Design a protein with these regions (language model features):
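Active-site bordering "gate/hinge" segments
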Residues: 1-263, 400, 410-412
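Short solvent-exposed loop/turn micro-motifs enriched in small/polar/acidic residues
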Residues: 13, 204-206, 275-277, 312, ...
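Short, glycine-/Ser/Thr-/acidic-enriched flexible segments
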Residues: 35-36, 104-106, 149, 218, ...
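Short conserved micro-motifs at the rims of enzyme active sites and ligand-binding pockets
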Residues: 111, 155-157, 278, 306, ...
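Long, well-ordered mid-to-C-terminal structural blocks that present hydrophobic/aromatic surfaces
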Residues: 253-311
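Active-site lining segments that contact anionic ligands and/or coordinate catalytic metals
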Residues: 261-263, 279-281, 288-291, 314-318, ...
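Dual-mode signal for accessory low-complexity, basic/Gly-rich regions
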Residues: 292-362
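Extended hydrophobic packing segments that form well-structured cores
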Residues: 367-412
């Protein structure tokens, strides 16, 4: 840590109080790299200060992951023991909240056997499928944040020394997370959330049938939205009314596309870090909601594996609007991390939708969600396609065209 300890303490408090908003006697589950133990201790201290029942750790280590994928057989990797399911089920039964701390190097697993990685991901996803709704339906609070590491910083700023790269990434993370020395991050987020909630309210009221996207990259895509869709921006609430901020940072307003209602071509505007590799220069062509053609300048086989993950991976689960004139975009930094990069540009997500994006969706069964037009998948992968010159038109139910974005920014 090169920034003052006070700055990291501010971020830790923000994550606990505003991010997951730990409640008295509620367990907090933290997923973090072993390298981040000092920051994790800060988070744990903040959690206990607000009355957390316990702090449960799920440690990760990239080097151990490489060894695991290199030396374990696929049979061993895909044999997910019942105790892992039971452990997560216990956390849910206790009403836990979840905090994930990102700091790993993008592309860290690029040299391991990707067939093993995919096999493990699919086996784990299948084992835990019925537990995913806990976070996807916001049954408990959850939040994702980022802190810098030298390994990550050198990918973002390869021409700088390790120390300079780390400090520059550190500054960028604090800035985009609205953590500063001379202000209260909790108040900063209260104001910011209010702005996003108001934008989402306006978009929901407009009740668009479709959105039409065009950009200088060649994107010409029409996305039909589900009936009774709901736009969400800023924080969210659990069924018990506990407010939390799922992403720190966030600049997006997002909703649910109709599974079979997407047509046209879309060109990604930023690379995508997926399964330990970085996919770049990629595009998709959709017909009746499904990706029917695609290409990539880098890691096309990895992109293919993403699309073939399961039956719903070639359909969209989310469409999100992010103005080009926003803190992350204005930083002109490519983070190679979806948490940050998705909040620099409009994005789409292949796979699983958020049920809350359709009216009463959190209370719907899987069949009811399907009937409403929702996609179904075990993964949710965001990719960025927003640009400086992106234009978006909203088509209302009566065919009226309403300009939504011009030259990358909101005009409503």
């Amino acid at each position: 840590m090169s920034a003052s300890k006070a700055m990291y303490q501010k971020l830790a408090k923000l994550a606990v109080v505003r991010g997951v908003n730990v409640q008295p006697n509620q367990p907090l589950v933290i997923t973090a790299s072993v390298r981040d133990y000092e920051f994790v201790r800060m988070v744990a201290k903040e959690a206990y200060a607000v009355g957390a029942r316990e702090v449960i750790m799920s440690w990760t280590d990239t080097e151990l992951a490489k060894l695991t994928y290199t030396y374990q057989s696929e049979e061993t990797l895909t044999d997910i023991p019942d105790w892992k399911y039971d452990m997560v089920k216990r956390e849910h039964d206790l009403g836990a909240c979840y905090l994930r701390i990102h700091s790993d190097m993008p592309g860290a697993l690029k040299d391991v056997d990707q067939s093993k990685v995919r096999a493990y991901q699919m086996a784990y996803s299948k084992k835990m499928k019925d537990l995913r709704k806990y976070t996807m339906n916001n049954e408990g609070q959850w939040c994702v944040i980022g802190i810098p590491s030298v390994e990550w910083a050198k990918v973002v700023f390869p021409h700088l020394s390790e120390e300079e790269a780390f400090e520059k990434l550190e500054d960028a993370i604090f800035m985009t997370s609205r953590v500063t020395e001379d202000s209260d991050p909790l108040e900063n987020w209260r104001i910011h959330d209010g702005d996003l909630v108001e934008h989402a309210r306006k978009l929901t009221e407009l009740n668009f049938k479709q959105l039409h996207f065009t950009s200088e990259l060649g994107t010409d895509l029409t996305v039909e939205l589900v009936d009774n869709h709901v736009w969400i921006g800023g924080g969210d609430k659990t069924p018990k009314g506990v407010y939390f901020d799922p992403n720190i940072p966030t600049e997006e307003c997002f909703t649910m596309p109709k599974k079979t209602g997407v047509n046209g071509i879309v060109y990604a505007s930023k690379p995508l870090s997926y399964s330990g590799k970085v996919i770049d220069g990629f595009w998709f062509r959709f017909e009746n909601g499904k990706v029917v053609d695609f290409g990539a300048k880098q890691e096309e086989e990895t992109l293919k594996s993403l699309l073939n993950f399961d039956e719903g991976s070639r359909y969209l689960g989310e469409v999100a609007l992010v103005p080009y004139d926003s803190p992350i975009s204005n930083s002109n930094i490519l983070f190679f991390n979806t948490l940050f990069d998705e909040n620099a540009a409009c994005h789409l997500a292949l796979g699983m939708p958020y049920p809350e994006n359709v009216k009463d969706g959190a209370h719907m069964s899987e069949e009811e969600l399907k009937a409403a037009g929702a996609n179904e998948s075990s993964q949710h992968e965001d990719f960025m396609f927003g640009t400086k010159e992106m234009n978006i038109d909203g088509i209302q139910q009566d065919g009226t065209v309403v300009p939504v974005f011009r030259n990358g920014n909101f005009v409503i």
